[in-house]
Regions:
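Alpha-helical transmembrane segments in inner-membrane proteins
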Residues: 2-367
Length: 367
């Protein structure tokens, strides 16, 4: 009896136990679909949506002339309003461009920092934005000044720069420090090329290019919003894939190989997506410095997740650009500063802090 009972027990099917990571909730999507949702990241994203909405309302209301929130709502809903010219023609399209540019920079920075595993691996530090700028400024000096064409030229320049950095940094693998240092070297070289174009071009065109290089939303309208808007819409499935693929990038090569994950292709796909987004954003508003550096790191600290959350990073990027442009318009009124000046003033000290902290971590806490 005992032997029979033991055999029956041993042959009984064993149910698989699913372990849910701490801090996550299971959300049902249809009869069969389920996915994990990080609770803190969801709360942070909801809070950022509210903050972004408040910033957008302030952006549309505040300017040389104040517009009541009720009039802003009328314009957005398409109802007759005396503020149609100020809000609908001037402020709203400029704000939409800022939202799209900030979101693109935020996602691009998150993807590239994830692959490089280095908070300094921002598109505007490792040469991607400089490559986009060099080709764009070169095109402007030859008479191509249409903002509907420049974003696509920026993509070509950004991809070319990223390919060079990736090729020179690859030595049987992608080492984070080597990737960043080679990127900084290319950024310096490409900035010199851009300066050469400025000195050889027509004075008026060079002046226009110089303003563009500081990162500005001045004069941006619906025609500038269309290219980057369509790009984000077309790349939305790739962005959703990237949000899931981020987890595999944090694996070591042996673990990824054992699980059948082609880690090299995943990394290349994430970098390519980040390069395209950063380049299109650069072509639309110029190199708005440090947005791609700030947004992902702040998002990660707010959510406390292992990976940089793309949604929170995109929302923070949009908040930084739109709020920065609002402050740039009002702080020194009637003089209007480019938004890139304000983001650089905030981002540069943060970059210095990151470098100092990294040095202290490597030296065991000693200066």
């Amino acid at each position: 009896m005992t032997g029979t009972s033991t055999t029956a027990t041993a042959s009984a099917p064993v149910k698989a136990v699913r372990v849910r990571p701490a801090g996550y909730s299971v959300v049902k999507a249809g009869p069969r679909g389920r996915f994990l949702l990080h609770r803190r990241a969801s709360v942070v994203a909801a809070g950022l949506v509210v903050l972004l909405a408040a910033v957008c309302v302030a952006y549309l209301c505040v300017g040389e002339s104040f517009v009541a929130p009720g009039e802003v709502v009328k314009v957005i809903l398409g109802q007759p309003s005396s503020a149609e010219l100020v809000v609908g023609t001037l402020r709203l399209p400029r704000m939409v461009v800022g939202l799209l540019v900030g979101a693109a920079f935020g996602i691009a920075g998150a993807l590239i920092q994830t692959v490089a595993r280095n908070p300094l691996a921002s598109p505007d530090i490792i040469g991607i934005s400089q490559g986009a700028s060099a080709l764009t400024v070169g095109a402007m000096t030859f008479g191509i000044t249409s903002y509907t064409v420049l974003p696509y030229l920026s993509v070509i320049g950004g991809i070319a720069a990223a390919a060079l950095v990736y090729t020179f940094a690859w030595r049987g693998g992608l080492h984070a420090t080597r990737f960043v240092l080679i990127g900084i070297g290319f950024a310096i070289a490409l900035r010199s090329v851009t300066t050469l174009f400025l000195t050889k071009g027509d004075y008026l065109v060079a002046q226009q290019a110089q303003i563009w290089m500081t990162g500005s939303l001045n004069g941006r309208g619906w025609s500038e919003a269309a290219p980057i808007g369509w790009t984000l819409l077309i790349l939305l499935p790739a962005i959703v894939w990237a949000a899931r693929a981020q987890r595999t990038v944090t694996m070591d090569d042996d673990t990824a190989t054992a699980l059948g994950v082609r880690l090299g292709r995943v990394r290349l796909g994430l970098v390519a997506l980040g390069v395209v987004l950063a380049s299109v954003a650069t072509g639309t508003a110029g190199p708005v410095d440090f947005v791609a550096l700030l947004a992902p790191q702040i998002a990660r600290r707010m959510t406390r997740t292992a990976q940089i959350p793309l949604l929170s990073s995109a929302l923070l990027g949009a908040v930084i650009v739109v709020l920065g442009d609002l402050l740039a318009r009002k702080l020194f009124s009637p003089t209007e500063l480019p938004v890139g000046v304000l983001t650089a003033a905030v981002g540069a000290p943060y970059l210095i802090w990151l470098i100092i902290r990294g040095h202290r971590d490597r030296s065991g806490g000693t200066a």
